[in-house]
Design a protein with these regions (language model features):
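Bacterial N-terminal signal peptides that target proteins for export
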Residues: 1-9
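Beta-rich carbohydrate-recognition modules and glycan-binding surfaces
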Residues: 2, 19-200
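Bacterial N-terminal signal peptides
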Residues: 8-18
């Protein structure tokens, strides 16, 4: 009887450890701003890209900041449609030695503080070759810290025929695009999230 109880106790402990391990993997942090500066928790650094690469005149600035008590990456700028331009973006390359494999996750989680404007989240994968191609999803960010969850199913390919392969993520970008406006978006956390089994 004693040995049976011991076996039962061991099984309980092992199952608890397994549940804890699975729960710890429900979110994979890519950047929580703990590295400081423009460096991400993933190791790569954020960089500013504007439509100047194609002759546009939009102006942008990317910096580390603190907004409402939280350390964040801050993207600011004025988006202009002149010269067939129209975007500023904060881009994080995630390929490193190999592309980021997000196949086991449901989508991307953002903790952001904005200015009431609509922004895009763009993904580039190994299937994306041309600079204007990306998989896009939109979100609106009010002037308050809040969490945005964007499922991978919400992304649409822009000028690309291949379906989104989240197993080969090479870049994630926060983008102000498509209309003339003043951008001001702060990011405190970027992560991959996994929906709980049986959850919504």
């Amino acid at each position: 009887m004693c040995s049976i109880r011991r076996i039962w106790l061991i099984l309980v402990l092992l199952s608890g450890a397994w549940v804890t391990a699975m729960a710890s993997q429900a979110v994979l942090v890519i950047d929580d701003r703990s590295a400081g500066g423009l460096e991400s928790s993933y190791g790569a650094s954020w960089r500013l890209i504007t439509d100047g690469v194609m002759g546009g005149v939009s102006q942008g600035q990317l910096s580390a900041d603190t907004i409402a008590g939280r350390a964040c990456l801050r993207l600011r700028g004025d988006v202009s449609l002149k010269n067939r331009g129209g975007f500023v973006q904060a881009a994080l390359d995630t390929d490193g030695d190999k592309p980021l494999d997000a196949a086991g996750y449901s989508g991307i989680l953002l903790e952001v503080y904005g200015n009431g404007e609509q922004y895009n989240l763009h993904l580039r994968t190994a299937d994306v070759w041309l600079p204007w191609q990306a998989y896009r999803a939109s979100f609106t960010s009010p002037a308050a810290w809040h969490t945005v969850r964007i499922p991978f199913a919400a992304f649409s390919g822009y000028r690309i025929g291949a379906a989104l392969d989240v197993g080969t993520l090479e870049r994630i970008a926060l983008v102000a695009i498509g209309r003339a406006f003043t951008a001001d978006l702060c990011l405190a956390r970027l992560a991959l999230y996994r929906d709980a089994p049986g959850g919504e």
